[in-house]
Amino acid sequence: MLSKRVIPCLDVRDGKLTKGIKFQGNVDIGDPVETARLYYEAGADELVFYDITASSEGRGIMLDVVDRVAREIFIPFSVGGGISTVEDMRAVLLAGAEKISVNSAAVKNPDIISLGAAAFGSQCVVVGMDVKHVGVSEQIPSGYEIVIHGGRKAMGLDALEWARTVEALGAGEICCNSIDADGAKTGYELTLTRMIAEAVTIPVIASGGAGNPDHMADAVTTGKASAALIASIVHYGEYSIKDCKDHMAKRGVKVRNIW
């Protein structure tokens, strides 16, 4: 059995670590490079960096931050935000990232997934899905809709259908983020996470809503995710990476420990 991964997520805006609730009310809370180093030393399995305004502002990638992070940590990390071409992907990987994450760009141009997978391998391509619960309809039979630009634009695209599509196009992993749960610390959207995880054969990362280690254990058991993405609970010092992994282990979840 593969170990379940604990992945801190660092949202970056203007070169600074930031955090909000449901993609709104973001406040700066620290230096992303220093925070990345601390999480690496604390036993994080991977890290995720999102430039949360690059896509909506139509600007490039935070390559300076990627380069500085790569010099400080020695675990896999992925980078998303502002990546819309194979050239963007190449630049991020050359700067030191192991994976690239595409979200809005993939919805607008799904070919970016297959082009990236062909150029760099599926293991490098993560598709981020921002998802909102809208109720079952003819257009959205699963009841979950894909949204982009931080949840501000609904796409009329069913989340379950999109997950199957991105796998077929060559994505190596899906990061499924619930806009409804994001930053609220009330738990992951387990129905959504399980639905996506059962529909595809590639790993699914649960994202949005972690408030305590129990929620993380729920995500990888009930939700069938391969990993739990976390932010607020570690950014604000409520729990350490060790706290999270120790509790998950007590729940019978296999995790990687460095202590």
Swiss-Prot record:
SUPFAM superfamilies: Ribulose-phoshate binding barrel
First-level EC class: lyase
Gene Ontology, cellular component aspect: cytoplasm
Disulfide bonds: none
Keywords (A to Z) from UniProt: Amino-acid biosynthesis, Cytoplasm, Histidine biosynthesis, Lyase
Pfam families hit by this protein: His_biosynth
Subcellular location per the Swiss-Prot or TrEMBL entry: Cytoplasm
EC number(s) reported in the record: 4.3.2.10
Main location: cytoplasm
Reactions this protein catalyses: 5-[(5-phospho-1-deoxy-D-ribulos-1-ylimino)methylamino]-1-(5-phospho-beta-D-ribosyl)imidazole-4-carboxamide + L-glutamine = D-erythro-1-(imidazol-4-yl)glycerol 3-phosphate + 5-amino-1-(5-phospho-beta-D-ribosyl)imidazole-4-carboxamide + L-glutamate + H(+)
Active site, UniProt feature: D11, D130
Gene Ontology annotations of biological process type: L-histidine biosynthetic process
Family: Belongs to the HisA/HisF family.
Subunit structure: Heterodimer of HisH and HisF.
Protein name (record): Imidazole glycerol phosphate synthase subunit HisF
Species of origin: Solidesulfovibrio magneticus (strain ATCC 700980 / DSM 13731 / RS-1) (Desulfovibrio magneticus)
Gene: hisF
